[in-house]
Amino acid sequence: MGTDSENPVLRNVLISFNLLLLGAVLKPFECRLEVTTEPAERPAVDEEGGLANCSPPVKEQPMVFHHIYNINVPVDSCCSSMLRSSAEEVSSEDDRLAEYTEQTSDSESQVTFTHRINLPKQACKCSTSLPSLQELLSRIEMLEREVSMLRDQCNSNCCQENAATGRLDYTLPCSGHGNFSLESCRCICSEGWAGSNCSEPRCPRGCSSRGVCLEGQCVCDNDYGGEDCSQLRCPAGCGSRGLCVDGECICEEGFGGEDCSQPRCPRDCSGRGHCDNGTCVCAEGYAGEDCGWLRCPNACSGRGVCQDGLCICEDGYGGQDCSAVAPPENLRVTGISDGSIELAWDSLGAATEYVVSYQPAGPGGSQLQQRVPGDWSTITITELEPGVAYNVSIYAVISDVLSSPVTTKVTTNLATPQGLKFKTITETTVEVQWEPFSFPFDGWEISFIPKNNEGGVIAQLPSTVTTFNQTGLKPGEEYTVTVVALKDQARSPPASDSISTLIDGPTQILVRDVSDTVAFVEWTPPRARVDAILLKYGLADGEGGRTTFRLQPPLSQYSLQALRPGARYHLAVSALRGANESQPALAQFTTEIDAPKNLRVGSRTPASLELTWDNSEAEAHSYRVVYSTLAGEHYHEVLVPRDTGPTTRATLADLVPGTEYGIGISAVMDSQQSVPATMNARTELDSPRDLLVTASTETSISLSWTKAMGPIDHYRVTFTPASGMASEVTVSRNESQLTLSELEPGTEYTISIIAERGRQQSLEATVDAFTGVRPITQLHFSQLTSSSVNITWSDPSPPADRLVLTYSPRDEEAPQQLALDGTRRHASLTGLRPSTEYLVSLVAVHGAVSSEPVTGSITTGMDAPKDLRVGNITQDSMVIYWSPPVAPFDHYRISYRAAEGRTDSTAIGNDATEYIMRLLQPATKYEIGVKSVRGREESEVASITTYTAMDAPLGVTATNITPTEALLQWNPPLMDVESYVLVLTRHTGETILVDGINQEYQLTNLQPSTTYTVAMYATNGPLTSQTISTNFTTLLDPPTNLTASEVTRRSALLSWVPPVGDIENYILTYRSTDGSRKELIVDAEDTWIRLEGLSETTQYTVRLQAAQNAMRSGFISTTFTTGGRVFANPQDCAQHLMNGDTLSGVYTISINGDLSQRVQVFCDMSTDGGGWIVFQRRQNGLTDFFRKWADYRVGFGNLEDEFWLGLDNIHKITSQGRYELRIDMRDGQEAAYAYYDKFSVGDSRSLYKLRIGDYNGTSGDSLTYHQGRPFSTKDRDNDVAVTNCAMSYKGAWWYKNCHRTNLNGKYGESRHSQGINWYHWKGHEFSIPFVEMKMRPYNHRNISGRKRRSLQL
């Protein structure tokens, strides 16, 4: 190494290295120092010390030496993870290596030394002591070696005048072909060198031990070659006909062998032959240049083409060698009836004909054949037996050679039952009859399915039965009756017809709380769905017709009002649906008699009371009058006949004067009697009777009388002279005579006597008396008419015993006499002749002495016309009629006057008996008088009052007509109108009174779709106009309250309230948002319909109107939106329920969602949250459950009645996941259930073993006893009992030894363990009438609950 002045660069390197050694001495650890020298070009350095872009010639490029010293921790050190390679970039301050860099450069030199020493910032202690100084010195020697090499390079050619000088103090170790390892103290040679000092050239891979290395080159053995003798040599060098690869020859096309010297066959004869000098000799069955073709058998018999060893036969031939006639292909059944089979096949063009052979599949059937031409491909075999399985074979024929047959087995249909008809129909029964079959079969199945598909009845009958009476049907229900013939597993096409049972009417009708005008009716409603209850009642004799009320169906009672008292009524209550009316429930009742009303006293006397009352409305024939004194004495009862007028009178006689009586009057009709109408009344005090003047003097008058019968205090006698000064005297009640004295002589006295009791006074008895003697002096005539006269006279004194009145016409000698009582003071003469003079005389008789007669004369007046009457009255005229008078006269005078107007009169001849009055005013009251006239004398006036007729209103019309209203309008008459009378007629008339100022009237509460006749006339007082009329028909009222409910994905239930009027049907139209529209005709009796087949998540608008003939009502409408489907292919009823199918019924599920495994099941969507698959039901015993293994495996029965779903289906369903089991049992109103939280049935290999979980419920646990048991039937005994449990207990079950429950036992059998038993509920001696077994997914309740909550959110 040179001096410091000579080589400052080296000096700097040594300084740095010494620092490194010092650090190593101060902090010893076991490390490994690696020094790497990297020669590189140095960029030029500018004057300021920066780098310049200078590119000297190649030989003069500067040299840069980078020395990197990495002091590394050994690999096995625990701290090695903290160190990084020298070449890595350090990314963070904490993990960076401690780096010391020094750069030494000479501006005059083109050599730069860079020293970078990397020390780990953190290092663990080395496990050994400080490295030996020898190793460090070796590093220094290496450094000086590199410096010596640098001197050699930097000669005058590259460094020019700045060439470095120095001396070589160190020889190169490892000959410059390797590195010296301080660890092993030996050379590690570079590739291609070897030896202790790496001075010996080395052969590649040591010639692979297959040759000798000479001066670095391999001399290979004979069979090998290549640079390293690793390649195999090929035989003969492949003879220039191939390529040597890994010692094997890849020969050119057409040559082969190890050395490619042999000719080669095409494709090596495909492995189906051997190559002979380039030519293939093929094995048997192959041919071709390369033996690639297959030979065909028998050269395809000349009837085909050989391809790939297979014969492609000509039409009509087949087989491996085309030697056989080909059978028809694709034989199929295209039609089956009860007597024929239609077959089709693919025709072969070469066939000359086909032979069709068929015979019954059962034993003993004869074989029949038919031949058809070869161009046929269909045939219909006829005249077959219904319900028979036939084996059918078809042969193709070519040149009398038959092909092998193609066969099929076909069963003809059973014939459709014929002649289905209904013999008798009641509310709950239908008797059906049909025609028998002439061929053997197993039996009949008849079903009665209601229109709403809820319930239904199915019965199986022997083949000999052709009539059937089905009982227990619902009244008023439409049923589809279907009759099907059965044979083996076949069913005939159904014969069906619809029939409706009669609607049942109300029953147990009861009439109670009957009074005179009210009766209360109760009944039991009908079971059938009806539109209305008709209540009809009327009088038993038919008077007044019948009144009908149309009541709403829920009503079961009604109060009849405004009845006629005492009348017998007939009552009928029936049900109505559409035009069908049930048989009525009949009753009769009689209203009570109403009591007489307005009881009053018309007149009273001391011994009588005259009673008057208004008659009862009832046709009472008499009245029972009961009366007695208030003290209860003198009780009397009398029966009084009913008067013909509105009132009846009765006089109670022989009463005690001055006494108060209690009176009760009841109406009596037959055996009925009304409640009494009561009152109190008092008789008058009776007067003294027979008051007589017994004697008379100049100053006194003696009187006598008969005493009053009633209790009195005294008598009061009043006497009054003509001068008018009255006097009175009181007489004891015990006296009956009195003499009045000190009277004025020759004076007339008026004497009266009354009886008194307290303030009550009797009527007075009066008599006129005269002191001294006074005869009758004059007759007085008054009220003279053409036929009568009144005569009065004064009292004689003393009083006469009797009076004799004599009268006669003047010119007649035969007078007439009247004998009168001496007390009489007047008389009336009647029946006299008109215009005749009469002589009248009166004689008073005293004992045997008669007074002188007192005489007078009169002349009667003219008689008036008789029988005056009016006829032919019009608005402005009328005719009066009369009969002529008796007395002669000159003419008639007729006068008439309006109520407010002048009087007109006219004279007509005496021979007239009628007269026409004209030019009168309409609706005017006229007073008409007719009298006869003779000279100046006129008769009395015969008069009559009448009215001219009113003019009628005009142009009555009905406008603004609706279903329940119409407006009547008219033009009024000319005269004033007090009121209009409208008579509105449908079936019966209704009278309406309208004020006369109106010219229109609004009719309301009309019946829709009804024709009305309106007649009207005007009235004014007693006057009425002519009647005018019009007709109109109300519009059809629409249904109301259209509602959509039970909306699911594909259906919705529409319901409505029917219109009031009669209709023919409904027109229902529904339209979706996409514009599609459908119209349905719905029967009139329906009030709901379920729309099916709707689109999911679609809004529908529904419009409904009623129709009657060509009439249409208005529309009502509603909208609804169908739901979406959660499960595209539901695998159980729970998924159907979550799809929105909420109605219980028959659904289709897909096992595991696979559409190819569809099963029809009955879903219970209501019990305990719904979603149950019902797999067994017992309810009426119509289905036989004592069946074989095959039946229980596949299932049987009617899903809507009694059935068993089938063990295979139950296994498949329960294999979908965890299911729970519920068993519902009912006995009348009593119910119980059992619940098991796990349920599964094994497959057929396990004999359908039962697996159930924990029990819960109300019935007790009777099923756990059967846990793990296989299923047993009468023909598969899998129980552990000595006997066959299924045979012993007439069922099929998971029997053990034998059972605690037997839900498939015999229906209705109560013998021990023989029926449908559940031991822990009803024991073994009770057959449960209703059982349902059902299953659903165990987590359904949670899932459905989450679904509902999500929908709410």
From Swiss-Prot:
The gene is TNR. Residues 1124-1339 form the Fibrinogen C-terminal domain. Residues 327-419, 420-504, 505-594, 595-686, 687-776, 777-863, 864-952, 953-1037, 1038-1126 form the Fibronectin type-III domain. This is Tenascin-R. The keyword Transmembrane helix does not apply. It is found in: Secreted, Extracellular space, Extracellular matrix. It comes from Gallus gallus. Pfam families: EGF_TEN (PF25024), EGF_Tenascin (PF18720), Fibrinogen_C (PF00147), fn3 (PF00041). Residues 1-33 form the signal peptide. Disulfide bonds join C296-C306, C313-C322. One of its GO terms (biological process) is cell adhesion. The keyword Translocase does not apply. Brain specific. SMART domains: EGF (SM00181), FBG (SM00186), FN3 (SM00060). Forms homodimers and homotrimers. Interacts with CNTN1, NFASC and CSPG5. PROSITE patterns: EGF_1, EGF_2, FIBRINOGEN_C_2, FN3. InterPro entries: ECM_Regulatory_Proteins, EGF-like_dom, EGF_Tenascin, Fibrinogen-like_C, Fibrinogen_a/b/g_C_1, Fibrinogen_a/b/g_C_dom, FN3_dom, FN3_sf.
